[in-house]
């Protein structure tokens, strides 16, 4: 054992080459990040173009490192540029000055309007910043600052990185940075001074030059010339006579009825306050040299009028109150309310109305003793007051959220047919001044799933929006909705069509509420046709109709057939006009007995010969070409029932029911039977109109593709046409064959209705009655957004702003995606409303600037165009150069704005009165300067000198300074030769 332990005792020392201290580990992490980002060596880029800092693309990369438990974020900021040729990259000469040092002397991008503060202060295109990761953390002590700066210096030296590396110190709001840039034998130190108050000796150029020269400490005499760039910024806040032109809407006129009801169909537009709060004028002297200009505590040559460059930017008011945005936002807030109409208004007028008519004896007396009401004496103009009277029975007038004048104006706007003393003639009324239906604006409702801009639904949305904002808020909305629902019931009960709705089945491209109103109109049409009791006989129709091309496509399931109502003879009247008013369900017992007596039950088992003995019924007109196959009689087109119109929620319910039947054979069979109700009805009508017909006859008319004819040669050698059913019609247990065997010869007028208008109308009215204001707002919000977009487009067309056109297209694209979903998210809806408000504010800013610059007052067309272009640039660009500086047309207007503001602030007499004053002495005493003291003064001093010794390499030196009322900052970049020092 002793022998074995001897070698172990010889191992007495282990050399540890790992980075031991936290400081060394931190330096290693910095080097690792620089290597990962490939920031090693010198890569010379192209010279910077003028304005590239603002127009170019800036990108950044970030990583996180830590010093012990203190976390730092490392961020690489760089301007995206085209890479230079490889040959240029390979030429990494030892004496080449790093790119960042060369950028210190660049003059093409002084005072960029929008850039990182280090870009503005030092003119760099690329740099790395190390800053505390947490916003609240800060490097405050001098020792920590020096430790970080030493770490940066070592990391740059070890890696050979030539990109400037900065460390943020002190609190973040102070924007204090120190840093370093290293190259082969050269180094630039970035230093900074930040004070609250400007020292008196440094309030002018001469004092700043003294600092710069002393900091450089150049041993040469005379000192090489210093290049100077100066910018003074003047702020205009008092616009004086240029009042904000927006006029608020006249609410009193609306309430008092002085304005027509059409005002309710118009949305307000514009900002309630001036959306332009300040105008900043920057006067710049870009290339000056020391000795040419004087600026000290006694005298200054820096007159803004004489500045060679003027540029302007406008400061926009933060979130200006905009009428259209407020309207839509307030309406959207209703979507989040939970109250029902009953809770808002108290006891429901709908329930009370139901209690009054609930007495069964009263209902029976209506049936046994009907009172005759001449329709022509019933004035339509009275119906706008009916709903109001019903509500007043249960609620005092003084409790109503809406007063009578407002309510009457709205109802007349929604129902313009109420002005007429004649009942409706059965046509749907629409406005004559609507945009053409082919126009892009009119068809926006397809994209937004709202409603046409001339529809009742669209008008209702606008009225509710205005009521919510001006006349009672949520209570007013609930009141108007209650009135609207009662009006719908009144129209249903009295057979008055609802105006402002397109005829035909519900349009599934529109919102659900619009579909419901269209469904109610369909019910009113059917009920009206039935109640009028118009009857026609098939014999009255002459045989002048052309042959029918067929009813269905090549689908097997009847529900999937193409629009059969078009193919079944649109020229004929609908089946409703054939029905008797007494036959509510078309199942009279006498008819059934008659059918049995006539042997119509034989239709199930008997052949065509037995059916041929039946009396034909329900014929519409004779087919022009076809005859029955078995007896050669002419084939007659029957009167058929129209398919039941459906809204999207009913279609969805039907789809769910069919889907629940499953995929089994029994489920599929049951699903096919449910879908074949319309097919069965048409077969029964066909059998009644064509006694002795066969399934082949029906298929030849209903689905010609399923009857295949081919030429064959008969026994005598003649070419004849022989036909047979298609392969799918011969499939065993075919639904068409089953339906044909089940179908009885019953004309449409005696069939059970496919569409029960009474039941469907009551379902719609119940649906409307139970809608909460929040549900209503959800239904109508697409219409409100649609109206807002149309309003914005209309206002933009007056201003012709290209940037606004692009934003409107984006809003339409975004809205069409969001609103097509059944229940869009609130956040996405808020985004759309916010975008609309931003566009409204943008148009308001354009109008504000046009008013201030007096574009309409320009007599010369060229000057007017220049001003309009200038205003447009102010809206779209962060800073706009004034052509001709203070001597150009725009410059003179800006000068005048400042002069007027100065005189108003000093309470001096106008210019005309100053001219009348006697001596020049008096005029001088009463006059004020044209411009206020500059709000900010910026100086950039540059030179190239050898440092630290006369024989050192001449390197770039730069100092940026900014002086404001409460801020004084110096940012210096001082380079030195490190070859022998």
UniProtKB/Swiss-Prot annotation:
Residues 912-925 have a biased composition (Basic and acidic residues). Its main location: cytoplasm. The modification Phosphoserine is found at residues 83, 379, 537, 579, 581, 590, 664. It is found in: Cytoplasm; Endoplasmic reticulum; Golgi apparatus, cis-Golgi network. The modification Phosphothreonine is found at residue 908. Residues 592-613, 908-937 are annotated as: Disordered. Ubiquitous. One of its GO terms (biological process) is regulation of calcium ion-dependent exocytosis of neurotransmitter. GO terms for molecular function: GTPase activator activity; guanyl-nucleotide exchange factor activity; small GTPase binding. One of its GO terms (cellular component) is protein-containing complex. Disulfide bonds: none annotated. Catalytic subunit of the Rab3 GTPase-activating (Rab3GAP) complex composed of RAB3GAP1 and RAB3GAP2, which has GTPase-activating protein (GAP) activity towards various Rab3 subfamily members (RAB3A, RAB3B, RAB3C and RAB3D), RAB5A and RAB43, and guanine nucleotide exchange factor (GEF) activity towards RAB18. As part of the Rab3GAP complex, acts as a GAP for Rab3 proteins by converting active RAB3-GTP to the inactive form RAB3-GDP. Rab3 proteins are involved in regulated exocytosis of neurotransmitters and hormones. PANTHER family: RAB3 GTPASE-ACTIVATING PROTEIN CATALYTIC SUBUNIT. It is linked to Warburg micro syndrome 1: A rare, autosomal recessive syndrome characterized by microcephaly, microphthalmia, microcornia, congenital cataracts, optic atrophy, cortical dysplasia, in particular corpus callosum hypoplasia, severe intellectual disability, spastic diplegia, and hypogonadism. Martsolf syndrome 2: An autosomal recessive disorder characterized by congenital cataracts, mildly to severely impaired intellectual development, and facial dysmorphism. Other features include brain malformations, microcephaly, and hypogonadism-hypogenitalism. The Rab3 GTPase-activating complex is a heterodimer composed of RAB3GAP1 and RAB3GAP2. The Rab3 GTPase-activating complex interacts with DMXL2. Interacts with LMAN1. Belongs to the Rab3-GAP catalytic subunit family. This is Rab3 GTPase-activating protein catalytic subunit. The gene is RAB3GAP1.
């Amino acid at each position: 054992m002793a022998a074995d332990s001897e070698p172990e005792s010889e191992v007495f020392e282990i050399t540890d080459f790992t980075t031991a201290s936290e400081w060394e580990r931190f330096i290693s992490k910095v080097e690792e990040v620089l290597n990962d980002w490939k920031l090693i060596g010198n890569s010379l880029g192209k010279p910077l173009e003028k304005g590239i800092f603002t127009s170019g693309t800036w990108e950044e990369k970030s990583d996180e490192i830590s010093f012990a438990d203190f976390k730092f974020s490392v961020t690489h900021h760089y301007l995206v540029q085209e890479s230079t040729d490889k040959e240029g990259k390979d030429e990494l000469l030892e004496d080449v000055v790093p790119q960042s040092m060369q950028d210190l002397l660049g003059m093409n991008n002084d005072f960029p309007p929008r850039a990182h503060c280090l870009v503005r202060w030092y003119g760099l295109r690329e740099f790395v910043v190390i800053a505390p990761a947490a916003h609240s953390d800060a490097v405050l002590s001098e020792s920590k600052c020096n430790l970080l700066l030493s770490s940066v210096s070592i990391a740059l030296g070890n890696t050979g990185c030539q990109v400037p590396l900065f460390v943020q110190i002190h609190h973040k709001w102070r924007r204090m940075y120190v840093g370093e840039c290293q190259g082969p034998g050269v180094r630039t130190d970035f230093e900074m001074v930040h004070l609250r108050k400007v020292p008196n000796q440094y309030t002018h150029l001469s004092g700043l030059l003294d600092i710069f020269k002393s900091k450089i400490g150049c041993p040469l005499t005379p000192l090489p010339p210093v290049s100077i760039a100066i910018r003074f910024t003047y702020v205009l806040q008092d616009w004086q006579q240029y009042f904000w032109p927006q006029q608020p809407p006249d609410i009193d006129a609306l309430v008092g009825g002085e304005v027509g009801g059409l005002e309710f169909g118009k949305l307000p537009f514009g900002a309630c306050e001036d959306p332009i709060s300040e105008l900043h004028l920057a006067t710049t002297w870009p290339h000056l040299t020391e000795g040419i200009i004087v600026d000290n505590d006694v005298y200054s040559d820096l007159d803004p009028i004489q500045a060679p460059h003027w540029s302007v930017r406008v400061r926009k008011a933060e979130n200006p109150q905009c009428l259209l945005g407020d309207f839509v936002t307030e309406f959207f807030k209703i979507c989040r309310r939970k109250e029902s109409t009953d809770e808002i208004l108290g006891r429901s007028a709908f329930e009370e109305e139901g209690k009054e008519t609930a007495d069964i004896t009263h209902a029976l007396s209506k049936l046994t003793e009907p009172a005759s009401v001449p329709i022509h004496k019933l004035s339509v103009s009275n119906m706008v007051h009916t709903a109001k009277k019903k509500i007043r029975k249960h609620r005092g007038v003084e409790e109503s959220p809406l007063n009578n004048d407002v309510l009457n104006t709205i109802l007349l706007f929604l129902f313009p047919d109420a002005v007429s003393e004649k009942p409706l003639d059965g046509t749907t009324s629409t406005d004559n001044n609507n945009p053409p239906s082919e126009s892009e604006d009119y068809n926006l409702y397809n994209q937004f799933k709202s409603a046409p801009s001339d529809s009742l639904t669209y008008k209702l949305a606008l009225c509710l929006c205005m009521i919510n904002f001006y006349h009672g808020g949520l209570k007013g909305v609930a009141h108007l909705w209650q009135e609207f629902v009662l009006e719908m019931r009144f129209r249903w009960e009295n057979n008055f069509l609802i105006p402002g709705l397109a005829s035909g089945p519900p349009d599934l491209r529109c919102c659900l509420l619009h579909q419901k109103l269209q469904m109610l109109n369909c019910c009113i049409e059917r009920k009206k046709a039935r109640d009028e009791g118009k009857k026609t006989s098939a014999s009255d129709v002459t045989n002048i109709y052309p042959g029918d091309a067929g009813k269905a496509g090549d689908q097997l399931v009847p529900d999937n057939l193409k629009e059969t109502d078009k193919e079944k003879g649109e020229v004929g009247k609908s089946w409703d006009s054939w029905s008797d008013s007494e036959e509510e369900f078309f199942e009279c017992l006498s008819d059934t007995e008659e059918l049995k007596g006539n042997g119509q039950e034989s239709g199930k088992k008997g052949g065509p010969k037995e059916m041929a003995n039946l009396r034909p019924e329900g014929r519409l007109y004779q087919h022009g070409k076809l005859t029955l196959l078995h007896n050669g009689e002419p084939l007659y087109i029957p009167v058929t029932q129209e398919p039941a119109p459906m809204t999207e929620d009913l279609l969805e319910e039907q789809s769910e029911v069919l889907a629940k039947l499953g995929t089994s054979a029994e489920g599929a069979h049951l699903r096919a039977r449910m879908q074949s109700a319309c097919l069965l009805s048409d077969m029964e009508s066909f059998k009644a109109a064509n006694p002795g017909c066969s399934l082949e006859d029906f298929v030849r008319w209903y689905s010609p593709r399923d009857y295949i004819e081919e030429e064959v040669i008969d026994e005598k050698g003649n070419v004849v046409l022989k036909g047979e059913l298609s392969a799918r019609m011969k499939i065993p247990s075919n639904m068409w064959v089953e339906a044909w065997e089940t179908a009885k010869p019953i004309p449409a007028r005696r069939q059970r209705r496919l569409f029960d208008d009474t039941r469907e109308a009551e379902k719609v009215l119940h649906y409307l009655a139970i809608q909460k204001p929040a549900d209503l707002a959800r239904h109508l919000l697409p219409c409100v957004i649609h109206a807002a977009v149309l309003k914005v487009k209309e206002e933009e067309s007056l201003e012709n702003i290209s940037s606004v056109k692009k934003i409107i297209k984006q809003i339409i694209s975004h809205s069409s995606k969001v609103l097509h979903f059944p229940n869009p998210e609130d956040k996405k809806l808020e985004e759309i409303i916010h975008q609309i408000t931003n566009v409204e504010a943008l148009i308001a800013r354009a109008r504000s600037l046009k008013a201030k610059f007096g574009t309409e007052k320009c007599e010369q067309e060229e000057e007017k165009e220049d001003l309009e272009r200038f205003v447009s640039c102010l809206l779209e660009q962060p800073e706009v150069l004034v052509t001709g500086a203070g001597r150009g047309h725009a410059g003179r207007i800006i000068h005048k704005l400042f002069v007027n503001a100065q005189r108003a602030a000093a309470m001096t007499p106008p210019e005309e009165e100053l001219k009348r004053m006697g001596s020049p002495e008096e005029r001088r005493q009463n006059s004020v300067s044209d411009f206020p003291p500059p709000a900010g003064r910026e100086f950039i001093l540059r030179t190239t000198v050898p440092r630290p010794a006369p024989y050192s390499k001449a390197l770039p030196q730069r100092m940026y300074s900014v002086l404001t009322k409460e801020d004084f900052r110096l940012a210096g970049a001082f380079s030195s030769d490190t070859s022998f020092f």
